[in-house]
Amino acid sequence: MIINAKGPASFAEKYIVRSIWENKFPPGSILPAERELSELIGVTRTTLREVLQRLARDGWLTIQHGKPTRVNNFWETSGLNILETIAELNPDGFPELVDQLLSARSSVSAIYFRGAIRNSPDEAVVALANINELEDTAQAYADFDYALQHTLAFSSGNPLYVLILNGFKGLYSRVGRYYFSSAEARALAMDFYKQLQQLAIDKNYTDVPALMRTYGINSGVMWQSLRDDMPVELGHSDT
């Protein structure tokens, strides 16, 4: 098992998670005793204990006082915070994971974009006020797009959408930089921003779903033309 890690704790975490992913520690099974596992991985028991607590918080494990540590079915117990980890564990499935991520984000954003322009149209106008000065670079568009999503999610009146969006952040930001490296993708987005801006100015929230649907289809087609050339490095976080 080849694991790239920046320290003992990172190594231990990646070792255990990969072992769960590869079914060496299958769902419902009991982890080896702390002493045995620390010797197997090559870290101190203190470090291992901290890692196990973190993995339990993320839904990989169940820890109960006086009982052995049990492996969970992470698909049932974890949240969006493990997206980065799944991307690293399954590089061959990364393009499909991104497809699913973008599809989910499009479905959810259609709700909070409409909510933002219905409940806080002036905030949407402010968020879109400087689009004509947006630097024509992948980084600038990726940063602006995420900031816009975040602002409108918060302005929708339901802060839970912000938490959902936060779960996408790391992976979405990296994919966004790649997507917006296409001049056509940037032009498509700018056209969308301008139409959205006009709806916000007009306080016309009823037409937002149709605009979101059209942009979702067009950006989806654009993504399909780019996905096969996506660098594998996009699936790796910096940790």
Swiss-Prot record:
Biological process (GO) annotations? fatty acid metabolic process; regulation of fatty acid metabolic process
Task: Quote the HAMAP family the UniProt record gives.
Answer: HTH_FadR (MF_00696)
**Matches recorded under Pfam families:** FadR_C (PF07840), GntR (PF00392)
MF terms in GO: DNA binding; DNA-binding transcription factor activity; fatty-acyl-CoA binding
What name goes with this protein?
A: Fatty acid metabolism regulator protein
Task: List, for all copies, the residue spans of the domain called HTH gntR-type.
Answer: 6-74
Q: PROSITE patterns recorded for this chain?
A: HTH_GNTR
What are the DNA-binding region positions? 34-53
Q: Which UniProt keywords apply?
A: Activator, Cytoplasm, DNA-binding, Fatty acid metabolism, Lipid metabolism, Repressor, Transcription, Transcription regulation
Gene3D superfamilies noted in UniProt: GntR ligand-binding domain-like (1.20.120.530), Winged helix-like DNA-binding domain superfamily/Winged helix DNA-binding domain (1.10.10.10)
Q: Does the keyword Transcription apply?
A: yes
InterPro entries associated with the record? FA-response_TF_FadR, FadR_C, TF_FadR/GntR_C, Tscrpt_reg_HTH_GntR, WH-like_DNA-bd_sf, WH_DNA-bd_sf
> What job does the chain carry out?
Multifunctional regulator of fatty acid metabolism.
GO terms for cellular component: cytoplasm
